[in-house]
């Protein structure tokens, strides 16, 4: 049996998690695990929209081996999420989504009014027009949205790669679906598919191809509101389309500085929204023997992809007095971003390290956020 405790703390998140796994719950290899986590995220520090979330997650995971290479996972869990949005800062479409699906949320913090009646014998909060009643409180621009979700997920995986860390042959397939049960505050579903293919071309060169696809939407009582924005897919950065800043591809919401003619403007303070549709992938040439150091290899790559809004309609916000949505909302081939570059992977004693240098081949907008040199340390999940 395995027991683990994990603590994470960085500029945008704090997370404490506990996990227990019995890998041989039955004689035929069925595993059972339990996970409990508490986390806080400040999305404004993570190249996403400006809101915060406080989360409690509890789940049970069942793993069923089908063959030596195939397995199925079943997950059932409960999520308690408290989102905080900020009037004038959180993108208008996000607040509208929550108000439409959950109903209006009162603002906070609230403060008592000043001593408007100028009467020292009455309490400061007394109404100046009616000393027997208090003044109404003045409330700020924060809004709290409590969300309770009961969810389930199932996934299939097939892995024929010859090495988990630095493979040179074989394939990896992963397909999954996640959904919330009817009766949850928001009814949604998500599909995902991941594919990797490795083939040696000779003793010193390996070809790799991969793709990562995703789609999500709402259903049932949530109607056609769309996938909850806090469940969106993201693209850009070391884990998808290198050469662009992490999470910044796809629709973004920002201020609109007018230009002449009045129908045009300059985007400012862009907040990436992610999307309900994800289409990304890569082609890569791996050089496993170019550097003799163990656990190290160099590659040359071509990345492609983007994320799109899906069923959510951002068009009504494009003439908003508060801001507008910029970028590619709907899927199209000319919206697919391309980048090319080189990368170094090193399985260092202190953890995996990856360094890449890439340049975009078809940056479409002036506000595309380019980041040529990217560095990651540790495994990301």
Give short role names for the model-derived ranges.
Residues 89-329, 375-380:
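C-terminal outer-membrane beta-barrel translocator/porin domains of Gram-negative envelope proteins
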Residues 1, 24-30, 66-70, 195-205, ...:
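Secondary-structure transition/capping motifs at alpha-helix termini
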Residues 299, 341-345, 354-356:
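Active-site scaffold segments
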Residues 1-172, 242-243, 247-254, 334-335, ...:
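Gram-negative/organellar outer-membrane beta-barrel architecture
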Residues 284-286, 337-345:
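Short glycine-rich, acidic/polar surface loops and turns
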Residues 193, 337-339, 357:
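Secondary-structure boundary/capping motif
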């Amino acid at each position: 049996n395995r027991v683990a405790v994990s603590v994470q703390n960085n500029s945008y998140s704090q997370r404490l998690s506990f996990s227990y796994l019995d890998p041989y719950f039955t004689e035929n290899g069925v595993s059972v695990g339990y996970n409990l986590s508490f986390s806080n995220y400040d999305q404004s520090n993570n190249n996403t929209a400006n809101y915060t979330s406080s989360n409690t997650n509890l789940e049970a995971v069942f793993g069923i081996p089908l063959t030596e290479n195939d397995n199925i996972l079943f997950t059932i869990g409960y999520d308690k999420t408290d989102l905080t949005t900020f009037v004038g800062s959180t993108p208008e479409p996000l607040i509208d989504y929550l108000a439409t699906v959950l109903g209006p949320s009162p603002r906070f913090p609230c403060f008592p009014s000043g001593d408007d009646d100028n009467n020292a014998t009455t309490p400061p909060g007394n109404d100046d027009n009616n000393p027997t009643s208090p003044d109404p409180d003045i409330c700020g621009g924060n809004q709290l949205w409590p969300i309770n979700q009961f969810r389930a997920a199932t996934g299939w995986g097939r892995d024929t790669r010859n090495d988990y860390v630095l493979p040179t042959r074989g394939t990896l397939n992963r397909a999954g679906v996640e959904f919330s049960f009817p009766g949850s505050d928001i009814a949604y579903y998500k599909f995902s598919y991941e594919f990797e293919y490795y083939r040696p071309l000779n003793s010193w060169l390996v070809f790799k191809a991969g793709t990562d696809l995703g789609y999500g939407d709402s259903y049932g009582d949530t109607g056609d509101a769309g996938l909850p924005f806090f469940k969106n897919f993201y693209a850009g950065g070391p884990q998808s389309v290198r050469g662009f800043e992490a999470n910044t591809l796809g629709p973004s919401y920002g201020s609109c500085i007018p230009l002449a003619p009045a129908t045009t403007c300059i985007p400012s303070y862009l907040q990436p929204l992610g999307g309900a549709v994800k289409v990304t992938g890569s082609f890569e040439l791996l050089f496993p023997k170019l550097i003799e150091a163990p656990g190290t290899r160099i590659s040359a790559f071509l990345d492609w992809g983007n994320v799109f809004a899906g069923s959510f309609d951002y068009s009504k916000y494009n003439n908003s007095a508060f801001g507008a949505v910029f970028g590619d909302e709907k899927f199209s081939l000319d919206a697919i971003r391309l980048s090319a570059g080189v990368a170094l992977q090193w399985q260092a004693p202190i953890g995996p390290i990856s360094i890449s240098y890439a340049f975009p081949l078809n940056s479409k907008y002036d506000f595309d956020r380019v980041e040529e040199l990217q560095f990651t340390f540790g495994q990301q999940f």
